[in-house]
Amino acid sequence: MKVIIIGMWNSFPKGMEPTSGYLIQKDGTSILLDAGSGVAASIQKYTSIHDIDHIFLSHYHHDHAGDIEAFMLARKMARQLRRTERNLKIYGPESGTIVKTIRRAKYSTFMPVRATKNYTVGPFQVEFHRNEHPVETYAIRVTDNEGGVFVHTSDSSYRGSLVRFAFGADVLVIDCKLYEGFDGRAEGHMNAEYAGRLASKSDAQMTILANLPHHGELEVLLDSAKQHPVNVIKLAEAGMKIEI
């Protein structure tokens, strides 16, 4: 599978770089994990917005789902112009005010996400893990038909169950909103030291620190994470391409 990081900033875009969005492609199938602010515009550097038939939302905070209505409007236009016969499928938690909007939309279909529910989309098997975050939030694990594994933690504090969920990932994208020394448990985030701990204990082949803060020296996040024995570890970059 091919993964393209569309955006990775926390809270709001930085310049022309969006918040959370991860495009995954294989065998003619494209899925999008999260549709944060700026993702609908930036994704068009890599594919047509009309080629995205499946969007998985980890939760409905704006930096993870702010552009979902732009994708819905794009699909409405494509359907009305007869460019496609398919509805846009939007997978997400059942709690959240946007769910009513999605359910009412004529050209979009809501697909509920739960920790016990899996979906198969083309060559991908998609699984979920309930996170520790103020709103209903899920980590997402994507396994392709050749056994390649991509895991996106989304927003969460550190949990042993998250280690088990992410174990053995080829690529693990971890929430790293906070620098070491900040306690993110109350707001459901990981600092860099805990991100490194998760990477180490889950034995990920490559770890990418994402949901990045807008302040400080980002290289310090890597230094903190590397206190734990990890394999390859990098900071997320908009436009980064990864082959699994």
Per-region residue spans from a language model:
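Metal-dependent catalytic neighborhoods of phosphoester/phosphodiester hydrolases
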Residues: G66-R75, K100-T101, E217-A225
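Active-site-proximal loop/helix segment associated with metal-binding centers of metalloenzymes
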Residues: P13-E17, K117-E180
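Metallo-beta-lactamase
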Residues: R83-T137, D144-E146
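Active-site neighborhood of phospho(di)ester-bond hydrolases with catalytic His/Asp-centered motifs
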Residues: L32-G36, D53-H59, D63, D67, ...
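A short helix->loop->beta-strand "cap" motif at the edges of active sites that frequently abuts
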Residues: T29, A78-R79, R83-L88, S202-M206, ...
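Conserved beta-strand hairpin/beta-sheet module of binuclear metal-dependent hydrolase folds
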Residues: M1-T47, E136-S154, V171
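Cap/insert and terminal regions of metallo-dependent hydrolase folds
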Residues: R159-K241
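Active-site metal-binding motif and surrounding structural segment of the metallo-beta-lactamase
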Residues: G38-N87
